[in-house]
Amino acid sequence: MFSQHIEKARILKKEVDSNLHRIKETKEIFTYYSLLEFRYQMLSGNFENDLEGFEFIQDQSDSFLKYYYHFFKFIYATEVGNYSSAEYHYERAEQLLIIILDEAEKAEFHYRVALYYYYLSQPTLAINHVNKSLDFFNENVGYETKVGACKNTLGMACVTLGQFDLAEEYLVSALNTFQQENEERPALTVRYNLGLFYADQDLSELAIRHLTSAFKQFGHPKEPYQKRGTYVLAREHFKLGNFKEANFYVEEGVQSCTKEYIYHFTILKAMIENESLEKLEELVLEAISYFKEHELFKDIQVYTEELAAKWYGAGDECKAGKYFYMSYEAKNLLKEKGRLK
């Protein structure tokens, strides 16, 4: 599973499941199996169930089971957008990393931490961790798919930094790797990210073309990390004045997204329906309360800047100044959080 070969993991799981009756005879082995089963479900795109019923592991002495418990809970919380919980389990897994001797597992830890920081719009920290991961995967045979995953993450971190030439280089390299390894789903993920890459450059039509293709091929239900793609599809259609299409993707998005993106979709829907500025302000302030709780300072920066511009256009310089300052504060907090430790 660490090498991210989904089909190979599926075959291996079938072999292990055939001996499940024996596994259940020993509590520690069954606990280990259950943790890996949870990890497999996430690898397969199933995030419906959290790791419940295994809280007792937290009270045990330090062990690899305790590490896996916190590490897998960290992955789950990151993917479903519960960043406060993710931070809690990340810190505890990091404390236990010292007892993990397998360098592949340490590399996997840094890869997952890189994704976490990417989701929090902290690209410098993301790049720092993904390079630690890539150092191992590049030097060892059998991790080609993982190398592709790391390059995909590097590409998206570069998008966040506005380094689009370098971002394209990483994303295309990742796509080539996945295609050579016949990994269709990861390759589709890169195509989806290419849509985000074009959207960040205000190339709406190109973004829509890539994202629409990925949206159709991914099918239902949508995985948590695809929430942004659906949102960006709606947003780019809105920017082009395609309100019917924008509404369609808003409705699709709210069916299977995290709480974080419920706020994004709700605000976008208000803009599509041309709600009053007062109503839009109310929705943004509700969202900001949530974003502050989870330290999503980039979102706070963007929305308060938009509110500032709208209030300035409406002739209310007092409110415009208030929101410009909030945007400035969020930008500084984001910069502070993103510094290398």
At which residue positions do the language-model features occur?
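Alpha-solenoid helical repeat architecture
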Residues: 25-30, 61-70, 101-108, 141-149, ...
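Helix-coil-helix junctions within alpha-helical repeat/solenoid scaffolds
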Residues: 219-222, 233-297, 305-315, 320-321
